[in-house]
């Protein structure tokens, strides 16, 4: 059976054929609003399922941007890999088809997408702690430090994901820093964007970060970890959509999440700033303490007991993460796939002000990331000069 894009009826027939539902009455709907996939919610009695099928192109561009369907298999493999070490934070996978590029997984509709929930004023008191634990566990347990270099290389071969890595390389590390067709620059930001495009130091540092992304295979990454890829409630957190998964630098997922916590402050900056900074604080401290505990208990690194080594590893992760966060702040402000955190600010004057802030904060994090050896340095990180220029 070859690939074809599913209709709602196709989705129902697949889950029924697989024995995941019986012959009882079924309701189903297409709910996907992403750029790369079809997503169907299927309910039969008390059983609720999600069927996600990859498309062979990016919907935002069309068939002129073809994509390999292999990413669907990579995504389900990553979900299963992450579930081995962080099961409370990963949806259960019931079935996957490589040929038809679909995965059937648990329905999470009892939770809300974090980005939308935050915009509606929802509170997620455990989110930062949960994601800190999730990333510490998924990154540590898929790294050389936990499984050794031979086993890691064998695992990494399963996550060769060139199409989606190419998207990241272009949309995060290249296009926002040049006059690219994919950019979406709001009128009134031209002077700020010119400042970025003409900043030689900034471009040099972005090039270094891109080189890290391309060449440094520390651990299995989610690859696209933002608040739109997380379902949560006050008590529960689930991370979805790891179709960008590949072996890359520890700091990338960490930086992506930090960037989107910054974005989550912008809809009501004066009120939310301190709350989001506290979230970043909780996230990093949970990540660092969990990673360090796993290292001390389970690392197979020959020099694992060398004085200060794990602290040096965490310092490097933090610095890289801040640089990657800066790139994401700039990309999501003027590049492809803008964030609702900024776009839904109705007052155009305020919206432009917040976008300028995001661009300057991003540039400052990129250029000055090496000032932060520890999280105490980040707490004291002063970008007043950049933000006031």
From Swiss-Prot:
One of its GO terms (biological process) is L-methionine salvage from methylthioadenosine. The lineage of its organism: Bacteria, Bacillati, Bacillota, Bacilli, Bacillales. This is Methylthioribose kinase. GO terms for molecular function: ATP binding; S-methyl-5-thioribose kinase activity. Belongs to the methylthioribose kinase family. Catalyzes the phosphorylation of methylthioribose into methylthioribose-1-phosphate. Pfam families: APH (PF01636). Pathway: Amino-acid biosynthesis; L-methionine biosynthesis via salvage pathway; S-methyl-5-thio-alpha-D-ribose 1-phosphate from S-methyl-5'-thioadenosine (hydrolase route): step 2/2. Signal peptide: none annotated. NCBIfam families: MTRK (TIGR01767). Homodimer. Its EC number is 2.7.1.100. Keywords: Amino-acid biosynthesis, ATP-binding, Kinase, Methionine biosynthesis, Nucleotide-binding, Transferase. Substrate binds at residues 224, 331. InterPro entries: Aminoglycoside_PTrfase, Kinase-like_dom_sf, Methylthioribose_kinase. It catalyses: 5-(methylsulfanyl)-D-ribose + ATP = 5-(methylsulfanyl)-alpha-D-ribose 1-phosphate + ADP + H(+). ATP binds at residues 37, 52, 106-108, 241-243.
């Amino acid at each position: 059976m070859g690939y074809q894009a599913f209709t709602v009826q196709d989705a129902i027939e697949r889950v029924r054929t697989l024995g995941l539902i019986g012959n009882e009455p079924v309701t189903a709907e297409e709910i996907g609003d992403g750029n790369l996939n079809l997503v169907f919610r299927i309910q039969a009695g008390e059983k609720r399922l999600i069927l996600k099928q990859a498309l062979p192109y990016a919907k935002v561009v069309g068939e002129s941007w073809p994509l390999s369907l292999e990413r669907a298999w990579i995504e389900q493999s990553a979900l299963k890999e992450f579930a081995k070490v962080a099961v409370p934070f990963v949806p259960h996978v019931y079935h996957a088809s490589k040929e038809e590029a679909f995965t059937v997984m648990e329905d999470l509709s009892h939770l809300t997408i974090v980005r939308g929930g935050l915009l509606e004023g929802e509170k997620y008191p455990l989110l930062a702690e949960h994601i800190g634990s999730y990333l510490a566990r998924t990154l540590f347990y898929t790294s050389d430090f936990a499984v050794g270099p031979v086993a890691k290389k064998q695992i990494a071969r399963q996550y060769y994901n060139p199409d989606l890595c190419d998207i990241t390389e272009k949309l995060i590390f290249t296009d926002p820093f040049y006059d690219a067709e994919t950019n979406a620059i709001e009128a009134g930001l031209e002077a700020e964007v010119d400042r970025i495009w003409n900043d030689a130091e900034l471009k040099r540092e972005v090039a270094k970060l891109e080189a890290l992304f391309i060449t440094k295979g520390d651990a299995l990454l989610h690859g696209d970890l933002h608040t739109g890829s997380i379902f949560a409630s006050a008590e529960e957190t689930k991370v979805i959509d790891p179709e960008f998964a590949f072996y890359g630098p520890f700091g990338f997922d960490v930086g992506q999440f930090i960037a989107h916590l910054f974005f989550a402050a912008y809809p009501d900056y004066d009120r939310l700033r301190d709350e989001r900074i506290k979230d970043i604080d909780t996230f990093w401290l949970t990540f660092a303490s969990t990673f360090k505990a796993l290292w001390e208990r389970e690392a197979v690194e020959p020099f694992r007991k060398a004085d200060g080594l794990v602290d040096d590893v965490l310092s490097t992760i933090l610095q890289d993460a801040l640089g990657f966060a800066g790139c994401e702040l700039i990309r999501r402000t003027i590049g492809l796939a803008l964030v609702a955190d900024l776009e839904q600010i109705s007052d155009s004057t305020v919206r432009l002000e917040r976008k300028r802030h995001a661009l300057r904060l991003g540039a400052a994090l990129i250029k000055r990331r090496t000032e932060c050896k520890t999280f105490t340095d980040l707490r004291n990180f002063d970008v007043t000069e950049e933000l006031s220029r």
